[in-house]
Each structure stands twice: as C-alpha cells, then as structure tokens.
C-alpha cells in the first residue's frame, strides 16, 4: 500500500508525463525545469498569511434555532517562490464547537505561521499536515484551511488540477450537497434554482 507521499510522487509523474525522476522534486534536490518550482533560484521558503473577514450571505440562512446573514471566515494564503495557494476557514456558529471560533482559529494560524518556514517545500504534505495537526487539538477549520492552501499550492506548482494528479475524471465527480435554509416556499424554490 502506498503512503501519501509515494502516491503524490507517482501521481505527479503520471499526470505530467515526465521522464524526469520525480524524486528530485520531493527530496529538495535540483528541480527539473518542467515543474514551476524554485524558478527564482533562491532558497525559497513557505510563508503563511491569513485574513479574517465576515462572509456576507446572499440570503438569510435560517435553521430551527436561529437566522443569520453572515459567517465568520478566515482566508489563508501559503506562498512559495512567488506562487500562492489559498484556503479558507469558515466557522458557522452551529459548528464552532467542532471547528473553532474566530479567536481560536487566528491563534492556531499564528502558530502555523511561526513554524511553516521550517519545511523546505510544500511537497512535504504528509509531514507538514501531521505537524500542523499536532500543534493543538481541535481547530478543525484552521487545519482544513492550511490543508486546502497546501494542496492548492502544490497543484499550482505542478501546473495540474488535483483531479488530474489523482487520475480522476471530473465529469464523474459526485454532486456536492449543502443546506438551503428554512424560508417561504417561493424563496426556497428560488434558492434551489440558483443551486441547480
């Protein structure tokens, strides 16, 4: 059975059809020009930035116990060699026990910001995410945002979307689901049409 790192090496190799030894990319050795990695030729390091904001909803979101028009959110950016990957930590009030609050997410991301530069490159996904997970229990939204930003960054560096890296057919991807809040029948029909 392949571990995550070996799978990424194999998948990247297959997706890009390269005859270059993929181990060079992941071992931090000289990087083939095929990849969009360390193009500046300097000792690139990852940098994490994060920006809190209030996500304004298009419609009032109502469930049995409350209504809201906003959701606390944090945008996460991980930059490496001039390329930026994006992630997001969303904390709807009814999930804050599991996901964290704005304050806990910001404090957790500050911890990650202080240590992410110790990893030589974003291709060490398994090691980085294991380290991030051990920083503190909980804070699932912040951890997910870092995970998403790292995957976005690696996909950009490999110049391939993840469905190709994983060898998937995007047309066969299952539909996603989400909650349409309680409203009048007319508004629920309108929201449903918007989502179709």
List each language-model region with its residue ranges.
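Short Gly/Pro-enriched turn/cap motifs at secondary-structure boundaries
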Residues: 64-69
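Short beta-strand scaffold segments in enzyme catalytic cores
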Residues: 74-78
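N-terminal secretory signal peptides
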Residues: 1-3
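Metal-dependent enolase-superfamily TIM-barrel catalytic cores that perform enediolate-based chemistry
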Residues: 162-196
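N-terminal export signals
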Residues: 6-28
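Metal- or metallocofactor-binding catalytic centers and their adjacent structured scaffolds
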Residues: 41-45, 50, 79, 84-157
């Amino acid at each position: 059975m392949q571990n995550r790192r070996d799978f990424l090496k194999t998948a990247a190799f297959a997706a890009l059809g390269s005859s270059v030894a993929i181990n060079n990319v992941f071992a931090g050795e000289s990087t083939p020009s095929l990849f969009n990695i360390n193009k500046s030729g300097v000792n690139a390091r990852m940098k994490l930035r994060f920006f809190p904001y209030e996500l304004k909803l298009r419609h009032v979101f109502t469930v049995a116990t409350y209504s809201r028009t906003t959701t606390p959110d944090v945008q996460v950016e991980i930059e490496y060699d001039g390329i930026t990957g994006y992630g997001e930590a969303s904390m709807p009030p009814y999930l804050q026990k599991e996901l964290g609050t704005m304050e806990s997410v910001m404090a957790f991301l500050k911890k990650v910001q202080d240590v992410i530069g110790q990893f030589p490159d974003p291709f060490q996904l398994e090691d980085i995410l294991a380290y991030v997970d051990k920083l503190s229990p909980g804070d699932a939204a912040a951890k997910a945002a870092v995970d998403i930003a790292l995957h976005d960054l690696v996909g950009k560096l490999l110049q391939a979307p993840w469905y190709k890296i994983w060898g998937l057919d995007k047309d066969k991807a299952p539909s996603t689901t989400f909650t349409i809040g309680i409203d009048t029948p007319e508004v629920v029909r309108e929201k449903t049409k918007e989502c179709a």
